[in-house]
């Protein structure tokens, strides 16, 4: 098994059967070696730094019905909410006071949160906290909207 793990580390790929064998392995020495190699690869790729981000779930309302998602439109068990701009700004204020320097505004594709509203919210956050990074994850938008968000101060956009 050690040979298989070494090959995985060097080639970054195995065949299906080899993956199954690794997943089903119960040998303590093999699992220790696998854990060691995984930690080594993680440290080489990402280092030892940990980055803390202030994640603000601004809405769980969504027009989409993605089966993997807990906030999909058809899920009637979810109590829906949308934060006001004032609440979002207050969350950023509190986060800034606690030392957060990256804010992630995340939520479903809520038609009530227009591109203009998002752009204005980002601009207000950026003007108050110019030393902070702003990341958005609010579903699919137009290219023009992404550009407007960037001009307003958002530096990243996560698209799932």
Enumerate the predicted regions with their spans:
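Core AdoMet radical
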Residues: 73-89, 95-116, 121-160
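Short amphipathic alpha-helical segments, especially helix-boundary/capping motifs
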Residues: 11-16, 65-69, 97-101, 121-123
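A broad detector of the eukaryotic-type serine/threonine protein kinase catalytic domain
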Residues: 19, 24, 71-74, 130
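Generic recognition of cysteine residues
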Residues: 9, 25, 91-92, 132
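Active-site cofactor/substrate anionic-group-binding motifs, chiefly glycine-
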Residues: 44-97
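Flexible, acidic/Gly-rich N-terminal and inter-domain linker regions that tether
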Residues: 1-64
């Amino acid at each position: 098994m050690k040979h298989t793990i070494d090959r995985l580390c060097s080639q970054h790929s195995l065949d299906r059967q080899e993956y199954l064998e690794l997943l089903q392995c119960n040998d303590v020495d093999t699992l220790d070696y696998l854990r060691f190699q995984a930690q080594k690869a993680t440290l080489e790729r990402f280092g030892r730094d940990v980055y803390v981000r202030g994640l603000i779930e601004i809405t769980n309302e969504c027009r989409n019905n993605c089966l993997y998602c807990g906030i999909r439109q058809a899920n009637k068990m979810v109590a829906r909410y949308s934060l006001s701009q004032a609440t979002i700004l207050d969350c950023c204020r509190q986060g800034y006071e606690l030392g957060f320097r990256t804010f992630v505004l995340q939520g479903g594709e809520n038609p009530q949160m227009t591109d203009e509203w998002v752009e204005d919210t980002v601009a207000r956050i950026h003007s108050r906290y110019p030393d902070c990074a702003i990341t958005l994850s609010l579903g699919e938008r137009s290219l023009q909207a992404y550009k407007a968000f960037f001009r307003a101060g958002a530096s990243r956009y996560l698209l799932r």
